[in-house]
Structures are given as structure tokens and as C-alpha cells.
């Protein structure tokens, strides 16, 4: 979909002297990322084949290993050069019905027997632990740092349906307002220095970059 250079956030940050890195622990040709990322202004792109020694959860590189990669990039950057890293994780990608030798779901919902729901919630907890690791690291960093954490979409209906059923609903009986909620995702903007605290603000992912720069 992107075939020419665009004035995206990495382009702007590069003009300010930032090193700009895109990292995605999956195949480089997915959605033509290896071609698109440079057009968006990233000076370096890192894909699955460069996640040497990474840990896996199910069949995907773990979020914990993604955090390790971000920290590695930060620690090896040239001193005094600011760094922008855009990391698209894979750990929690669907589907959620298969079984794996390296992952045992350990979260359940009372009154619900659902492998997809249990698997998804257990994966989210691992993501939460990885985020804690990332935040804890940059809390101690001397350089001012902002972390933006968000998802691109909610899990599929195999995960949502059991919760809806528990509340007497199905995916087909949702009102228009309820259906809209299926297309909302939470986000967090955190910094290791004082910024204006705000909660409950609805926005579009299109505007997250502007919010961070504000």
C-alpha cells in the first residue's frame, strides 16, 4: 500500500538527529515491511532472522525477547544520539486453540471453559510482565525516555464470545454501541520524567505520535 516516501514520524525524528529503528520478530516480507519501513523513514529494520537466541512462546518470539532487543538497541547506540524504536510484537498473535510444548495457559475465567480465552489471557499476562521489565529498565535510565504501548486490534471472536455468552450476549446480538467497543484498544504513554498525567482519553492510533510530540 505504501510505494513512495511519506513524511511519517521517523522522517521527522531523523531530521532532529534520531537514530530510527523498526523491529518486528517475524518475516521481513510480511506486508512488505522490508520495503515499507525505509519509506517511512527508518534507517534500520530488524526482523526475525536477527533475533538470535530469542525465547519463544508458542510459535512466536516472546515479548520478553522483544524487550531485550529494545534494551540491546538502546545500550549499543552512539552516546548522545537519541533513539526511536518502533517494535511490532508477535507473541499474542492468533489463533488461540492449538496446544504447545513450550506454553501452558494458566489463567481461567470462573464459569467458562474456553481454550482460546484461557490462552489469550495467559499471553496477556506475559505481555504485562514484559512491559514491567521494560518500564523498570528505563526508570533507571539517565536519558529522558517515553514508552508508548498499544495494540492494533482486539482478539478474534473465539476469545470474545465466551465472555459475551457469560453475560447473556452473542456477537450477533450486540448493539451498535457495543459493537464499537470491539474496535477499541487501550494504550499507555509513560515517561521516566514528569509529564502531564491524564487518563480515560479516547483517541485514534493515528494521533498517538502527535500526542507524544505535544
Task: Give each language-model segment a name.
Residues 1-214:
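Solvent-exposed soluble domains appended to multi-pass membrane proteins
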Amino acid at each position: 500500500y505504501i510505494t513512495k516516501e511519506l513524511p511519517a514520524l521517523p522522517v521527522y525524528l531523523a531530521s532532529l538527529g534520531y537514530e530510527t529503528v523498526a523491529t518486528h520478530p517475524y518475516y521481513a516480507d510480511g506486508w512488505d515491511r522490508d520495503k515499507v519501513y525505509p519509506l517511512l523513514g527508518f534507517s534500520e529494520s530488524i526482523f526475525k532472522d536477527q533475533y538470535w537466541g530469542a525465547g519463544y512462546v508458542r510459535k512466536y518470539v516472546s515479548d520478553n525477547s522483544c524487550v531485550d532487543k529494545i534494551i540491546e538497541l538502546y545500550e549499543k547506540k552512539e552516546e548522545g544520539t537519541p533513539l526511536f524504536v518502533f517494535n511490532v510484537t508477535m507473541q499474542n498473535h492468533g489463533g488461540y486453540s492449538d496446544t504447545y510444548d513450550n506454553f501452558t495457559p494458566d489463567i481461567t475465567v470462573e464459569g467458562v471453559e474456553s481454550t482460546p480465552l484461557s490462552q489469550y489471557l495467559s499471553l496477556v499476562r506475559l505481555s504485562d510482565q514484559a512491559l514491567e521489565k521494560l518500564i523498570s529498565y528505563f526508570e533507571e535510565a539517565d536519558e529522558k525516555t517515553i514508552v508508548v504501548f498499544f495494540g492494533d486490534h482486539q482478539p478474534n471472536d473465539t476469545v470474545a464470545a465466551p465472555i459475551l455468552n457469560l453475560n447473556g450476549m452473542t456477537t450477533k446480538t450486540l448493539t451498535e454501541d457495543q459493537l464499537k467497543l470491539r474496535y477499541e484498544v487501550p494504550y499507555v504513554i509513560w515517561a521516566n520524567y514528569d509529564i502531564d498525567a491524564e487518563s480515560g482519553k479516547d483517541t485514534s492510533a493515528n494521533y498517538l505520535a502527535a500526542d507524544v510530540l505535544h
